[in-house]
Structure formats: structure tokens, C-alpha cells
């Protein structure tokens, strides 16, 4: 099989054209990365190709369709690819690890998309690198499928995220807790700059590299800071604002990242490294899915505090750049860090107002939202479907109590619903406009954990990717109700409920 694959590669080498890759990160000094070619695999097979994203990246679709298995497995890269593994450190569950880096991923190049935005292309699972730490550098099929489905679902939900361009099976096995099929994911990101990237150089007191990295981050993600009197303080503020908005968006849809280490905290403000991520079914602010998060550090309700903690770690790396006077630098950074949670609270409350049909601000809004969440928690109400069914409850023809019964909520809902209706009456919008706002703010479908597991099991056990394709299609338009995909709106039964998720590394 390997021989025939090599023959295909030899024939194909004459056909492949350059993709138009650029390499601004590779132009940095070599302490920022390690050069490494992908490790070839025996029998790659393309099982997912994101044609919409490929078109946005101005990639040649006929080439991807014909030769995607070879390209996206890393067996045969475009001639202008220059693969590198990025160096970074990170705080993992609060403990500092001075060297992590891309242990199984290779950045093969950057593309400027049709909107003029620079995007990284990375192969995840492409083989060992100098940062693999005795790992095999490979990815299992299940985690690749999970990241593909969830990252694309997050994009459809309107939440900043890395995206999935393609996924291939490798024809080889990987050994984790058990022997599993191998796979490679092609990830697209605004960049792969992380808080941990800054920590890597700061831990070595390599301040020239920290400054070089900070200037690169500003040029790429915060160009408005060029020419600013205090660009590095501005960088810290920019990251704080984007991370506050990102976590507020996560919590709007019940998303739990699961492993918010600083090496998984993006400077661009995107969701990155999905690992043991999951969406809540029944609302519980203390929900934890990750099997390795035994203390609940990254529970749903802890995410804003963890984002602030991660920001403080970034601030520590930037202090010498913010001001030559350490006391002044600390004071300036502290103000940014302290402002992050109030900023998050404002963004979160704005999101929650929209979820219950409100556009204007009122002093009682927070209490109104929190009371509903408390009722949902006590009753074990499904987070997604409760808010989606509230869209119907704005219609005058439906009594609040009928809506409450539909969710399985207690009689407490009736009293809350009356106060909610009174608050809606204070708005200048019509009932139809309120309902429309809610339908744009409350998805009908999310990537429910049991549905993802069903798709993974079908692929792993029976080589059946039909459930994966169908689930992916159902998640493309999450705010539009569809009879065709009604099954994906239904919460899991007790027997179907997924209680633990895994990183897959």
C-alpha cells in the first residue's frame, strides 16, 4: 500500500501548483520555531473538505478534491509550503511548563483570504517535532472529528474561532488508552500566537524576543497601535477586550472550553484548541466535562476568572516593555487586568438581554436574567432549548405557564415570566421584533455531546462517516429551525448523556 501511495505522490508532484503561501512568522529568528517536514502516512483518505472555507482562502478546489488526501496528510505539500513547529510555554492547570511547543502540529504557511485577512494553515497530527516530548506527533480520529465539528459550529454561531479546512484518515493506528484510527486536521487560524508564546521567551529573560513577538502581534492583530505612545500597554488592553468578548460569547451558548491553559489562550481572540470542549445540556454553572479537570478549575462559571488569570500571565511578560519604571508598569497593567471582569460582565449581560428579547438597558435586567438561570438550575432545564422556547413565549397567544411546562420548569417560572413580560413591554420594539432578536440570539441546534460521540463511534467502529456529514450539515445554520434536522435539537436522555470528555493527546 505504501508503494502505491508513493507512486501516486511521484505522479502528483508534477501537477501541484503553489498555493500562494507567505511566511511572515518564519521570517522571525529561529528561536521562535523549529523546521520540520511532516511524517508520511501509508493510506491517507480525505473524509472532510470545507469548500466554502477553501474558496474564501482562494485555494484551487479541483486540486484539493483530486489530491486533498495527499496534501492534507502532509504526504505531498505544495511547493511553497515551509513547515515549522512553533515554540511556546504555558501554565497548565496553574502550573508553569517552560517548554511545550507544537508537538504534533506544523504551520505550513499563511494565506491572505478574499477579505484581506492573513490566515495560518496548520496540519494537526502531522508527526513528531522537536517539541513532541516523547509523543508520537499523531492525532486520533475522534478528536479530529470533534474539533472539525465544534469549530465549524462555533463559526456558524458567530463566535470567533479557528476553523477546519480538511480532515483525513491516515490508514495508520495511534495508541492512546486503546488503539485508534489516526487522522490529520487542517486548521485555519488568524494566527497561532498564544499567551504561552510570550511566556516562553519571558521565562528565559529573552526580552528582545518578547519585544519582537509583541511587535509582530501588533502588526498582525492590532495594527491601529502602530505609532501609539504606549503600544505594548495597548496590546494588553486589546487582548483583554477580545478575551472578555470571547468568553461572554462562549457563555451565551453554554460552551465550556475545558482546558483554558495559557498555551490555549489566543492573542487574536479566537477560540483555539478544542480538546475536551463540550456544550452544556442541563444548566449547571459548575459543569465540568474534561476528564483531566478533577478540581473543576475550568468549570463553566469559572471561565471569566480564568481568562483574567491568563491575562495577568501575559501582563507579566510585557512589564519591561510597558514602562522602564517597574512600579509604573505594574500599576498600568493592574488597571487593565482589573477592568477585564467588569468589561466581561457588560458584554455578558448584553448577550443575555438579547437572549430574552431586550435591546435597551434597565437596572433590573441582571436580576431578571440571574433569576431565570437559578430556576433553570434547580429544575435541570436544558440551557439551549429553554432559551429557544422563550422565543415562542413572546407571542401574546401563548400563556407563560404553557411555556414553562414545555421546558419542565417549576411554577416559579410563572412569576418570573410575568416580570419578563412587563420588562418587554418597556421596550419600543414590537413582539415580532423581540421574537426575531431572540431567534438570532438563541440557537435551535448546538453540537450536542452525545451526537458528536455517535458520529465518532460510527466512523471509528464501522468506517461510516454518514453521521458525521449529517451532523455537520445540521450545524451549518444553527439559528434556523429545520424539520430535516429536528432530531439534533433534542436534548439527550439520561442514558445518552455524556459526562466526561477527553483531550485525545
Predicted regions and their residues:
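Regulatory N- and C-terminal appendages and interdomain linkers associated
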Residues: 8-88, 289, 294-505
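Active-site-adjacent bridging/hinge elements
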Residues: 25, 29, 119-130, 214-218, ...
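Short, contiguous strand/loop micro-motifs
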Residues: 37-39, 136-138, 233-234
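Conserved ATP-binding subdomain of kinase catalytic cores across diverse folds
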Residues: 43-46, 51-227, 245, 267-270, ...
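ATP-dependent phospho-/nucleotidyl transfer catalytic cores
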Residues: 143-144, 173-257, 268-374
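Hydrophobic residue at the +6 position relative to the catalytic HRD Asp in the kinase catalytic loop
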Residues: 260-265
Amino acid at each position: 500500500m505504501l508503494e502505491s501511495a508513493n507512486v501516486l505522490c511521484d505522479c502528483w508532484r508534477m501537477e501541484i501548483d503553489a498555493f500562494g503561501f507567505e511566511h511572515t512568522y518564519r521570517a522571525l529568528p529561529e528561536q521562535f520555531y523549529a523546521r520540520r517536514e511532516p511524517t508520511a502516512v501509508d493510506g491517507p483518505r480525505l473524509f472532510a473538505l470545507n469548500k466554502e472555507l477553501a474558496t474564501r482562502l482562494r485555494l484551487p478546489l479541483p486540486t484539493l478534491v483530486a489530491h486533498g488526501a495527499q496534501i492534507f496528510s502532509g504526504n505531498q505539500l505544495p511547493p511553497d509550503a515551509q513547515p515549522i513547529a512553533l515554540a511556546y510555554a504555558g501554565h497548565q492547570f496553574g502550573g508553569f511548563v517552560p517548554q511545550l511547543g507544537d508537538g504534533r502540529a506544523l504551520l505550513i504557511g499563511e494565506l491572505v483570504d478574499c477579505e484581506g485577512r492573513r490566515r495560518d494553515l496548520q496540519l494537526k497530527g502531522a508527526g513528531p517535532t522537536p517539541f513532541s516530548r516523547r509523543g508520537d506527533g499523531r492525532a486520533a480520529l475522534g478528536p479530529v472529528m470533534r474539533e472539525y465539528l465544534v469549530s465549524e459550529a462555533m463559526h456558524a454561531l458567530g463566535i470567533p474561532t479557528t476553523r477546519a479546512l480538511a480532515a483525513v484518515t491516515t490508514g495508520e493506528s495511534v495508541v492512546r488508552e486503546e488503539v485508534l484510527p489516526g487522522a490529520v486536521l487542517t486548521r485555519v487560524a488568524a494566527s497561532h500566537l498564544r499567551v504561552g508564546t510570550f511566556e516562553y521567551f519571558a521565562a528565559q529573560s529573552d526580552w528582545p524576543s518578547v519585544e519582537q513577538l509583541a511587535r509582530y502581534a501588533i502588526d498582525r492583530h492590532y495594527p491601529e497601535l502602530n505609532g501609539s505612545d504606549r503600544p505594548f500597554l495597548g496590546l494588553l488592553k486589546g487582548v483583554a477586550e477580545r478575551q472578555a468578548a470571547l468568553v461572554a460569547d462562549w457563555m451565551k451558548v453554554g460552551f465550556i472550553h475545558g482546558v483554558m491553559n495559557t498555551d490555549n489562550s489566543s492573542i487574536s481572540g479566537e477560540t483555539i484548541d478544542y480538546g475536551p470542549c463540550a456544550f452544556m445540556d442541563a444548566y449547571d454553572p459548575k459543569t465540568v466535562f474534561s476528564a483531566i479537570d478533577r478540581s473543576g478549575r475550568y468549570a463553566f462559571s469559572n471561565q471569566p476568572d480564568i481568562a483574567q488569570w491568563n491575562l495577568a500571565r501575559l501582563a507579566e511578560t510585557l512589564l519591561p516593555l510597558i514602562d522602564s519604571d517597574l512600579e509604573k508598569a505594574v500599576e498600568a497593567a493592574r488597571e487593565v487586568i482589573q477592568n477585564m471582569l467588569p468589561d466581561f460582565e457588560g458584554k455578558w449581560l448584553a448577550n443575555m438581554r438579547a437572549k430574552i428579547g431586550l435591546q435597551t438597558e434597565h437596572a433590573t435586567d441582571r436580576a431578571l436574567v440571574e433569576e431565570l438561570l437559578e430556576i433553570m438550575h434547580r429544575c435541570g432545564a436544558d440551557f439551549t432549548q429553554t432559551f429557544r422556547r422563550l422565543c415562542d413565549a413572546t407571542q401574546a397567544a401563548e400563556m407563560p405557564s404553557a411555556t414553562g411546562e414545555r421546558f419542565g420548569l417549576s411554577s416559579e417560572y410563572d412569576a418570573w415570566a410575568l416580570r419578563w413580560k412587563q420588562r418587554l413591554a418597556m421596550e419600543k420594539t414590537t413582539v415580532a421584533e423581540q421574537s426575531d432578536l431572540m431567534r438570532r440570539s438563541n440557537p435551535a441546534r448546538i453540537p450536542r455531546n452525545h451526537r458528536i460521540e455517535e458520529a465518532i463511534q460510527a466512523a471509528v467502529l464501522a468506517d461510516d462517516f454518514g453521521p458525521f456529514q449529517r451532523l455537520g450539515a445540521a450545524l451549518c445554520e444553527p439559528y434556523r429551525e429545520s424539520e430535516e434536522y429536528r432530531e439534533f435539537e433534542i436534548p439527550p436522555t439520561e442514558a445518552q448523556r455524556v459526562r466526561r470528555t477527553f483531550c485525545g493527546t
